[in-house]
């Protein structure tokens, strides 16, 4: 069993359901301390984080990731217990195998191999690890970034170990992500009897034309790196459960996934202008989960592409598709950010798994990126 596979198994065996760490970070920091990293453990509320650095000065290449996992669901539906790492037909099964304990193991073993070859490397290597990525993400990476900024430390390049690949490891690199802007809209009407609509105001009827306009709106056209901004309603709640009562209010939850062609403020203003056009009486609450970011061609992209060609035999696609990641907290500091990890086909699913051979490929790829930037 390779060092990367062994460490991945050790991490999977710890049931670190968000925001629990369950001892995963202790495993990692023990290994990193042994090769000269200075470790700073950072606990914010119920969340464990750590920042580890090797090297005294110069640009920082940071490995970022999370030890927490999503709940396993019904264990009886798994082909093997979700926290007992099991290898079957070349696949490693277990919760977190792909998202993202396999990546964490590859990061650590890549650094061990790199430091053994280059004990006096240039620049600095860092780890920013949290147990609060799969949950509300309020006391994890975002807090560590604030802590780093307060003491004037800036990450130059950042590799986030999210499972970016689709068919084979290294076939896709995420070099950006769309922004995410959520909203809860409560439209007020007047409750009444369905037989006497003239004595009531039906908020469903009132808001329906506005929602149709919002859904039909062309928010932007996207660009070479991002698709057009999308608007999606995820929840619509109204009514008392009775069939003869017009509801007094309707609550709608919707989300924008937006490109760099739009800003959160612009989307808010345009949304509220459409609502105003329809004369609605409403309350509105916005939540910005993250701004869009893009890492263009440069040192980090070049290093990653070179490494993937050499270690995976793939020609990677640069993509900004998919959901958000903790890269959204790191990119605004000015860092170049990429997401590079294993195949994402089974993440958050029953029988989550990762190809065993891909773990060593990923470790070798991370090691090659270290060589390209810091050797």
From Swiss-Prot:
Q: Which Pfam families match?
A: M20_dimer (PF07687), Peptidase_M20 (PF01546)
Q: Does the keyword Transcription regulation apply?
A: no
Q: Which domain of life is it from?
A: Bacteria
Q: Which residues bind Zn(2+) 1?
A: 66, 99, 162
Q: Where is the active site?
A: 68, 133 (proton acceptor)
Asked whether the keyword Amino-acid biosynthesis is assigned, the reply is yes
Matching entries from InterPro entries are given as: Bact_exopeptidase_dim_dom, DapE_proteobac, Peptidase_M20, Peptidase_M20_dimer, Peptidase_M20A
A GO molecular function held by the record: succinyl-diaminopimelate desuccinylase activity
Pathway where it operates: Amino-acid biosynthesis; L-lysine biosynthesis via DAP pathway; LL-2,6-diaminopimelate from (S)-tetrahydrodipicolinate (succinylase route): step 3/3
Q: Kind of enzyme, top EC level?
A: hydrolase
Which of this chain's residues are annotated to bind Zn(2+) 2?
A: 99, 134, 348
Which keywords does this chain's UniProt record carry?
Amino-acid biosynthesis, Cobalt, Diaminopimelate biosynthesis, Hydrolase, Lysine biosynthesis, Metal-binding, Zinc
Enzyme Commission code(s) on record: 3.5.1.18
Q: Which residues form a coiled coil?
A: none
SUPFAM superfamilies with a match to the protein in the record = Bacterial exopeptidase dimerisation domain, Zn-dependent exopeptidases
Cofactor remark: Binds 2 Zn(2+) or Co(2+) ions per subunit.
| Swiss-Prot/TrEMBL catalytic activity | N-succinyl-(2S,6S)-2,6-diaminopimelate + H2O = (2S,6S)-2,6-diaminopimelate + succinate
Please list the cofactors this protein needs.
Zn(2+); Co(2+)
What are the BP-aspect GO terms? diaminopimelate biosynthetic process; L-arginine biosynthetic process; lysine biosynthetic process via diaminopimelate
Concerning HAMAP family, the annotation shows:
DapE
Q: How does it assemble?
A: Homodimer.
Question: Family per UniProt?
Answer: Belongs to the peptidase M20A family. DapE subfamily.
Q: What does this protein do?
A: Catalyzes the hydrolysis of N-succinyl-L,L-diaminopimelic acid (SDAP), forming succinate and LL-2,6-diaminopimelate (DAP), an intermediate involved in the bacterial biosynthesis of lysine and meso-diaminopimelic acid, an essential component of bacterial cell walls.
Record protein name field? Succinyl-diaminopimelate desuccinylase
Q: Which organism is it from?
A: Teredinibacter turnerae (strain ATCC 39867 / T7901)
Gene name of the record:
dapE
């Amino acid at each position: 069993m390779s060092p990367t596979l062994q460490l991945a198994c050790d991490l999977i065996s710890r049931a670190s359901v968000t925001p629990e760490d369950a001892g995963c970070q202790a495993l990692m920091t023990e290994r990193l301390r042994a090769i000269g990293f200075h470790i700073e453990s950072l606990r914010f509320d119920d969340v464990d984080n750590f920042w580890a650095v090797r090297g005294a000065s110069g640009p920082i290449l940071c490995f970022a990731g999370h030890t927490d996992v999503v709940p396993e669901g019904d264990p009886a539906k798994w082909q093997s217990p979700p926290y007992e790492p099991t290898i079957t037909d070349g696949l490693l099964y277990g919760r977190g195998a792909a998202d993202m304990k396999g990546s964490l193991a590859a990061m650590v073993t890549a650094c061990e191999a790199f430091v053994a070859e280059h004990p006096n490397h240039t620049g600095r290597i860092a780890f920013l690890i949290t147990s609060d990525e799969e949950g509300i993400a309020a006391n994890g990476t975002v807090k560590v970034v604030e802590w780093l900024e307060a003491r004037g430390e800036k990450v130059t390049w950042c590799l986030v170990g999210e499972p970016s690949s689709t068919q084979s490891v290294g076939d896709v690199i995420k070099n950006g992500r769309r922004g995410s802007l959520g909203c809860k809209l409560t439209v007020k009407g007047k409750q009444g009897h369905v037989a006497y609509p003239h004595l009531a105001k039906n908020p469903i009827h009132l808001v329906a034309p506005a929602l149709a306009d919002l859904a039909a709106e062309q928010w932007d056209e996207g660009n070479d790196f991002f698709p057009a901004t999308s608007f999606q309603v995820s929840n619509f709640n109204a009514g008392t459960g009775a069939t003869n009562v017009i509801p007094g209010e309707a609550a709608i939850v919707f989300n924008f996934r937006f490109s760099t062609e739009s800003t959160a403020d612009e989307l808010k203003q345009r949304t509220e202008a459409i609502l105003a056009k329809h004369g609605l009486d409403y309350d509105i609450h916005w939540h910005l989960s993250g701004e869009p970011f893009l890492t263009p061609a440069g040192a980090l992209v070049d290093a990653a592409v070179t490494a993937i060609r050499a270690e995976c035999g793939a020609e990677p696609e640069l993509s900004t598709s998919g959901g958000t990641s903790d890269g959204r907290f790191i990119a605004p500091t000015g860092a170049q950010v990429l997401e590079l990890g294993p195949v994402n086909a089974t993440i958050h699913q029953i029988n989550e798994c990762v190809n065993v051979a891909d773990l060593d490929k990923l470790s070798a790829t991370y090691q090659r990126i270290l060589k390209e930037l810091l050797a």
